[in-house]
Amino acid sequence: MNILIIFASYLLGSLPTGFLIGKYLKNIDLRTIGSGSTGATNVLRNVGKWPALFVFIIDLGKGLIAVKIAQYYTDQGLIEVIAGISAISGHIWPIWLRGKGGKAVATGLGMFLALSWKVGLASLGFFLIVLTKTKYVSLSSISAAILLPIFMFFYLGKFMHSYFFISLIVALLVIWKHRTNITRLLKGEESKINQTQ
C-alpha cells in the first residue's frame, strides 16, 4: 500500500496543469515561453490572471491531496512526508512532459498546509508580504522557502523530526529551482509580477 501511495502521489504531482491550460486557452507551450516553467507565474504572464489562479489552486491541491491520502491510509509520518515529496517531484519533473515542469512553490505549499497548516499559512503570509512590498514573485518564493524550516522548527520545538528535515529539503529544492531568478535579481534584470519576461 505504501508503494502505491508514493507512486500515485508522483503521478498526481505530474498532472501538467499549467501546460494544459496554456495549450487549451492559447495553444502555447509554456516550456518554450517566458521562464519556461509550467507554474502559475508563467501562466499569469502568458495566459492570464484567472487561468493562473486556477493553476495555482490545482498545483497547491496536488501537494495537499497527496499528503491527505497518505494520512488516511497510514499512520506513518514518514510515508506522509514521502508522499508529499513525491508530489513535488512529479510537479518539477513530470513524466508527461519529459521532466520539465514547475518550481515546486504551490505544490510545496499544499504539502505543508497538510502536514502543518500553521507552518503553511505562516509561509504563505510571508510570501504575500514580500510580494506586496517588492512585486517579485521569485524573491517572495525564495524568502518564504528560506523561512520554511525556521517556521517548522518553532512549530515542532526540535530539529530531529522528519517534518523539519523535509522542510529543509523542500526549501533547498525551491531555492535551487530559482537559481536563474537569483542571478537575474542580483543583476537587476528580474521581471516583476506585472511585467512579461
From Swiss-Prot:
Keyword check for Transferase: yes
Protein name listed in UniProt: Glycerol-3-phosphate acyltransferase
Subunit structure: Probably interacts with PlsX.
Catalysis performed (reactions): an acyl phosphate + sn-glycerol 3-phosphate = a 1-acyl-sn-glycero-3-phosphate + phosphate
Transmembrane segments: 1-21, 50-70, 77-97, 111-131, 137-157, 158-178
InterPro entries: G3P_acylTferase_PlsY
Recorded GO MF terms: acyl-phosphate glycerol-3-phosphate acyltransferase activity
Membrane association type: Multi-pass membrane protein
Species, as recorded: Prochlorococcus marinus (strain MIT 9301)
Subcellular compartments: Cell inner membrane
EC number: 2.3.1.275
Main localization category: membrane
Top EC class for this record: transferase
NCBIfam families: glycerol-3-phosphate 1-O-acyltransferase PlsY
Keywords: Cell inner membrane, Cell membrane, Lipid biosynthesis, Lipid metabolism, Membrane, Phospholipid biosynthesis, Phospholipid metabolism, Transferase, Transmembrane, Transmembrane helix
Biological process per Gene Ontology, one example term: phospholipid biosynthetic process
Primary role: Catalyzes the transfer of an acyl group from acyl-phosphate (acyl-PO(4)) to glycerol-3-phosphate (G3P) to form lysophosphatidic acid (LPA). This enzyme utilizes acyl-phosphate as fatty acyl donor, but not acyl-CoA or acyl-ACP.
Cysteine-cysteine disulfides: none
Pathway: Lipid metabolism; phospholipid metabolism
Family note: Belongs to the PlsY family.
